[in-house]
Each structure stands twice: as C-alpha cells, then as structure tokens.
Amino acid sequence: MVYKVFLSLCIGLALSASAALHAQKAVSGHAPIQVETPARSSGQKHVLQLVTPKLETVRIGIIGLGMRGPGAVERFSKIPGTQIVALCDVLPERVKKTQEILVKAGLPEAAAYSGSEDAWKKLCEREDIDLVYIVTDWKTHAEMGVYAMEHGKHAAIEVPAAMTLEEIWKLIDTSERTRKHCIQLENCVYDFFELTTLNMAHQGVFGEILHAEGAYIHNLEDFWPYYWNNWRLDYNRKHRGDVYATHGMGPACQLLDIHRGDRMKTIVAMDTKAVNGPAYIKNKTGEVVADFQNGDQTTSLIRTEKGKTLLIQHNVMTPRPYSRKYQAVGTDGFADKYPLEMYCLRPAQVDSDIAPDHEKLNAHGPVSEEVKKALMEKYKHPIHRELEETAKKVGGHGGMDYIMDYRLIYCLRNGLPLDMDVYDLAEWCCLAELSRISIENGSAPVAIPDFTRGNWDKVKGYRHAMAE
C-alpha cells in the first residue's frame, strides 16, 4: 500500500514537473508584441551622420518662454555665432520680459509673436531663421518640430520631443525627407560625471559595457502648480507608462552605442498602482480621481540585439532623493552616480600613476575618493576641458545646458553631425508608448522598432564630432 502511494506521488510530481516545463517553454516561446514600422518612402534616405552646410551665424527662433525658454535666451546671448531673431509665447508678457534679457546683453530685441496658440507658425515661416528651438509643453513638441523642418529650419526640441510612435515616425520621416537636423534637447548627456564616464568607457576602462541604468526620480509635488494650465500633472493623470524617460535613457544608450553598433530589441515594463497622484488632486481640489493612469513608480527593462540590458525607472510622485540612476556595468569595472559618485575597478584597470598601491584596490568596493578624482581628471572629456569653466559660470542645471547649446551651435557652424540625431530622439522617447503597451498586456515583452530601418550597425560606436 505504501509503495502504491509512493509510486502515485512520484508519477504526480513527474506529471506536474512536465506540465510546468511545458508551460515554461510555451511562455518563453511567445513572440514579443509587434508594433508597426512604416516603410521608408521612395527616394528617402537615412540621416545617420547627417551634415548640412556650415552656418557662420546661426539665426534662432525660440518658441516657449515659460520655465526653460528664458534660460535658453540667456545662454545663447553668451555663445558666439548666434543671433536671436524671434521669440514666441502664448502670453505677451513673457515675450516682453524675455526681451529684457537681450537688451541687458546689449543685443537687439527680437521679433515678437504671441497672443494665439498658433502664433508659433508665423515664426517658423520666417525666411531669416536657421534653427527653431522648441521649449513648450510635451503635447506640442512634435507638431512644432515637423512644421519647422517643413519650412526649411533645423529643429531643436525640448524633452520628450515625442510622446507617441506616430509622432516619432513623423519626425523621422520629415528629417529624412527635408535633410534637416532634428535634435532632442537632452542635457543630461553633457553632465560632468556622465561625460567623463563615457570617455572612460571609450578608453576601455570598464571592459565591455554589458548593462546600463538610468532614471528620472524627482518628487514634483512642489512643482505641479508652475506648469502652464496644469499640463504636466494632467498628462500623468491620463497616460500610463514611462512618460519622461529621456534623462535616464540618453546617457545609458550612449554607453551601449545604440544605433551605432547595437540596437534596442525588446522591452518589458511594469508599474505600481497610482497613489500619490490622485491624493494630491484630492488634497488640492477635493476631486476624487479613480482612474489616475500613471503609477507612482514605473520600471522598464530592455534587451539589446547584442545581448545587453538597460534598466530605466520613472518616479515623480514619492518622496525620494533626486536621482537619474546613472550606472554602467562592465566586464572589468563599474560606475555609479547616485547617491554618491563612485567607480569600482579591477586593479589592472587603474594605471600605477593614479593608484600606485594596488593592494588598496579590489573589485568589491569603490576606489578611494583620491583615486576617483584622479580618474576623473585623467579621463576628463575634451568637451569639458574646453567648456567646463565657462559652463559653470553661465549655468543651466550646473552647466550642462550651456554645453548642450554650445555643442549644437558648434556643430551647425562647422557643418558637423550633431551629437544627437533624430534616431536618438526616437529611441529615448519610445518608452512612453512601448512601456504602456507592455504594462497593459501583463508586462509582456514588446518589440522595439529599428528606427533607422536597417542601418543601426553602419556607424561603429558613439563619438562626438570635432572640427579639424
């Protein structure tokens, strides 16, 4: 009897194990959810490494003079080879106030456009503008960028430049068709730790980079009232997924040479329930919101074509220290920016002139502060060697905004490929829709389009263009 029970139990366990294995194979065999990749129109070509005729003076029109636009005017007034031709905002008083920045800098006032939500179109239609610089709310970014390029202008668009795949493809197709630059104004790729770490990666200090992390973790509770017509909180209320991924994505993708030798292939995302968003609205207005879409925290995991991974987080709702989570994991080393900047390296990866006593280095803890400073000085990026002092004086998120604008103008004046192209824009913005699709399908994997449409491996590694 005991033997029969034992035999029955063994058979049952075997059948259960077989069923579990079969289920696992079935799940692992599921193809990722596919999204459409529109065919490239006949005669249209990619804009990888796009160069355009040199501009001795870059004539600029700026749309949006709220939280960020006036700072851009201030920075451009200090960058050689620029001219602010036109300013635009719905509110006339913002245009008038921003004109004071030009006057204070000893520059002529710009043409003014205001009083209408369509006034920006007149700015784009001017024939004396080379670059339209767009710093408005998210929902208007892509439309303005497309319109600017269609009217013969390069487009520089604040993050995120596009919120849907449809908007992304419109920007790509317009840039390819018009042969105009379309750059997303992602400033975090120019921050000092990030750019130094990128240079270290290029020099092989970390070995092969296998994994990178990024995030936007910033409690915006005190800032919600300052967004015009409550647009930002309203967007989070209506949209699920990582709606603001670019600050984390940009530096991480540059580390992994995305569309410069590798490409993002699949994404899996999940989120928490929404708690603090609806609570904030109830506290401020008394309204009970039962369908607030954006979870307090959203996490996305991405696999690349060459077997590397990215982890991206979004949280603007809970009280946490500010963090962009910048992290690089290599075969021979590690970099981490938050909460404390640190490097962890094999002793062999550190030159003896930096750390003469190798016994004090190991791969289980960070290098000393002294060694870290020496590494950051040794591998300081050439862009920082040129611009760091001025950038910190001018300011703009500690100087990285100035470097971003300077590099944009530098490349346009020298006829060089920009530091970021329209495919970077696409890759860093696509999480807004793709993470939502994954979440709404039980965190299923979603295929990430090849926004270069077959050209992701043509450029060998990410580098900044420099004039000879």
From Swiss-Prot:
Residues 1-19 form the signal peptide. Binds 1 NAD(+) per subunit. The NAD(+) cannot dissociate. GO terms for molecular function: hydrolase activity, acting on glycosyl bonds; nucleotide binding. It comes from the Bacteria. SUPFAM superfamilies: Glyceraldehyde-3-phosphate dehydrogenase-like, C-terminal domain, NAD(P)-binding Rossmann-fold domains. Its cofactor is NAD(+). Substrate binds at residues 216, 232, 244-247, 322. It is an enzyme of class 3 (hydrolase). Its EC number is 3.2.1.-. NAD(+) binds at residues 67-68, 89, 138-141, 158-159, 187, 244. Keywords: Glycosidase, Hydrolase, NAD, Signal. Transmembrane segments: none annotated. Glycosidase. Belongs to the Gfo/Idh/MocA family. Glycosyl hydrolase 109 subfamily. This is Glycosyl hydrolase family 109 protein.
